[in-house]
Amino acid sequence: MAEMRGMLLMLLYISHSSSAICGIQKATIADKLKENLVSSTEFPWVVSIQDKQYTHLAFGCILSEFWILSTASALQHRPEVIAVVGISNMDPRKTDHREYSVNTIIPHENFDNVSMGNNIALLKTESAMHFNDLVQAICFLGKKLHKPPALKNCWVAGWNPTSATGNHMTMSILRRISVKDIEVCPLRRHQKTECASHTKEPNNVCLGEPGSPMMCQAKKLDLWILRGLLAYGGDSCPGLFLYTSVADYSDWITAKTRKAGPSLSSLHLWEKLVFELPFHESNIALTTNSFSIHTYAEWPHSYSQGQRMSTKSNKQKDAGQNFRVNRQPETSGPSKVAIQPMYYDYYGGEAGEGGAVAGQNRLHWSQERILMSFVLVFLGSGV
């Protein structure tokens, strides 16, 4: 009976695994590339949010096949936006990048474009994103745990400012810089923001842009977790910066996606087992897409998208990057757009100096082991 139950659970989980697995990347070693470059299979959840002229507006992170988390400030007055995925290497001669039309944007209802409080937004793609080695979802904590999981290898990723473009970012290959949380922070913070600092001596330029993700690994699981979205600072390395704490918005995310559909997978039981039990009880490679939140923001826009084009130039526009890619975006017909608040670009991403690369854990869990671990936890919990 137990074996039959386990097999049924396995089949059920496999049937939903495309949306349940998160925080796993193919890269298994620390790539010691020059200038803190990110290898092609690292950070497969980072996307570029662009307007219809293919101008880069902000970064975002994939939470599921349909949902992306980004900043509200960069998405005001943007009637048509797309998500370009698999952006670790933007060289069109080597990589063909897929675009997905965004048909719904849900900014936080209390977003303040003056103070930049609650600067967070959900984006829903019109069609499901196809996951592969270059495109995956990242995990995030589905609630505030009594004992938060220990994290390691925290990085911020972004485009690299160059002398040729000044403060503008050059879209080529993502860079990464090691960062750490700071308990005593001299910066003025809003509620639900945290303070962090670059960790190494000043050698390289810093990476700062709206929505630049701060990503860490959970020590017990080696799964990647979206810790935050860059909010302010990062002009110099080493230096302080603020980021929007994603964990503080987990209930909001769950509620919004549940109401808009499809809802994000909520695995709070497994999250509790994995993160709150002693290590010998929780040393399981469980992927926790801990998301969800409700209440619909008053900014549910529908967007249409034009054709996919090949990357040919990096012309700057609106202090962003202008580029084209090769395929037709996953899209449907246009629909009317609601009136949006005034657009406010709050972060210029000025170049600084310094930074370094944090090491990356070498352990890589196969999906088969993850699925089996999930079933073992399920059976052991008596659910």
UniProtKB/Swiss-Prot annotation:
Protein's UniProt keywords contain Cytoplasm: no
GO molecular function list: serine-type endopeptidase activity
Keyword Mitochondrion assigned: no
Annotated region described as Disordered, given as residue ranges: 305-334
Key words of the record: Disulfide bond, Glycoprotein, Secreted, Serine protease homolog, Signal
Entry GO CC: extracellular region
Family: Belongs to the peptidase S1 family. Plasma kallikrein subfamily.
Species this protein is from: Mus musculus (Mouse)
Domain Peptidase S1 stretches: 21-258
Compartments where found: Secreted
Signal peptide stretch: 1-20
Polar residues bias locations: 323-334
Disulfide links within the chain: C154-C216, C185-C195, C206-C237
Protein name: Inactive serine protease 54
